[in-house]
Amino acid sequence: MASPVNRTVIISGDSASTIETVTARSELGSTAAGTPDTSPPTSRSRSPDEPKASTSTDASTVPLEPMEVKNICFVGAGFVGGPTAALIAFHNPHIQVTVVDLNAERVAAWNSPHLPIHETGLPKIVRIARDGTNETTAFLPTINKTIKVAPRTPNLTFSTDLENGIGAADIVLICVNTPTKTYGIGAGMTADLSAVEGASETVAKYAKNGAVVVEKSTVPTGTARMIREILAQYRPRCEFEVVSNPEFLAEGTAVRDLMNPDRILIGSNTTPAGLRAAAALKGVYAGWVPESKILTVNTWSSELTKLVANAMLAQRISSINSISAMCEELGADVQEISRGIGADSRLGKKFLHAGVGFGGSCFEKDILNLSYMARVLHLDTVADYWMGVLDINKYQRQRFAEKVHRALNGNLRGKKVAIFGFAFKEGTNDTRNSIAVHIIRQLANERPREIAIFDPGCSPEEILSEVGQHIQDEPTLAQVKVRTNWRETTDGASAICILTPWYHFHYPKQAQATARRTSLWNGSKEQQLADANTGFLGPHPTEMDLIELENCVTRGKNKVPLDPLKRLKPEACPENCKGCNTSSTNAEGGGDPVDWEEVSAMMKLPKLVLDGRNVVSAPELEKLGFKVQGIGKGVGM
């Protein structure tokens, strides 16, 4: 008989000492005690610490009493909690969704026209769910038929009342920050779980017995156990199930990603209670996500999948960036290489765009976390492998700053450098750990006359706040100026650095992408009339049906209004609204596109354009008098 296999499982990423060794079943089916394993097979592997199901019945086939979900609460109104709550409320009008946060200013912003997060399409979705809609009609001229659209009652609330918000919920989702730890054991590597711990304690105090607690935050593998233990400590007589449901949305395209996700991942125990909890959460997403895209796994697999997904996306970026350095020496064009390898169906074309590197709050943090877990498990080769992804990223941004220095003859004194783009990617106002701030810090050390920054999606306050965290020296910080338009930014500049690929900066100009419209209403007149006569696809049209109806009534129009069906209720700001008094742009493209011919007339020689995102055509810009250097290509390419 095979001997038991010992394996180590990460319980928490907070310290190297929090490791527990458990005995796993061998491949031959023996238990730790050496007796035959009679536990039933299940459709997925167990989490290491979950209780085993009865040996007489397969846990995955136990009849489960469905859990009715009437109320959901999100703890945390940030980049994950706010948009996810809005989309769930939008697609589930029968469920009351509450988002609670201790930050009163953030909650007030969610309850105003000035949302704290800039995501394309999000304001309209929030308004529909938060404020409700008017009864309206839509006329379809092709069939000469008027469709009646019923009003909708509000079902999305933002509040600072944690006790009532959590207490009423059938499902509570924890959506708080898990930044890299800055102190003690694991500093600079593992995740700081203090916010998750605090949120779990709050949930334990107020949640009703039987509530499902969902970890939505990105966490080290094994964090669900910590949450489970906190719940048991505070409420030992209550029964809670902890489920993992990591988010896979990308900032800048969050609404699109939530509307049509590649997958929804739900991790739970394989006990009857765990499966029941997973089924309840699955039912919420089933309001608009096909069942084939909702994957159920064990808790630890779910937690680890999120880290691995981000690490592998970052790995692709670093891989192509490493090749870009070779291209510049060999005379090859990295964009042509990207097209060549991206055409291989085994590789695909996504995340193969060479640039100045990746930033943001996720990729670097999650790779550090993954590497730290490997190090704790004594898998040093694995840890070093993933750290190499970050080494290339740091090398790429340092290489870019050095390129700017060389292009200006090794001297920035008395010169103005313009920065186009500060957000870590286009389509968002998130400035956390942006590539731009690292480049600016290096350039500021060269004592230029001015570093002028313009980003069409960020307010000056947001940019200065992030810069101030990285540059504390007052004389150096005084060199940095944030401008609200590209004209002020480039006037008198010797060089422009393009660091975020907003469409505003492209040359030749690139039209904003528009989604290809498809609709159930695109059929023949007879089919449309039949659909209309049935009462608009049945008595209870979904929001997806209404989106399709909007597409139908606006087809052929050059300019599509925000609210073609006139469903939205008017928004009003309170007196002395802080949002109205704050200068900001928006992530859908505030400001006009850059007129490069006008820029050329305003700049000083040598009129350098350092294109860190390969969004301009060097030959075309050079016709206007610029000298252009891109990423992964020779001068003038």
Where are these regions (language model features)?
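Structural/interface elements that position substrates and couple domains in central-metabolism enzymes
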Residues: 2-637
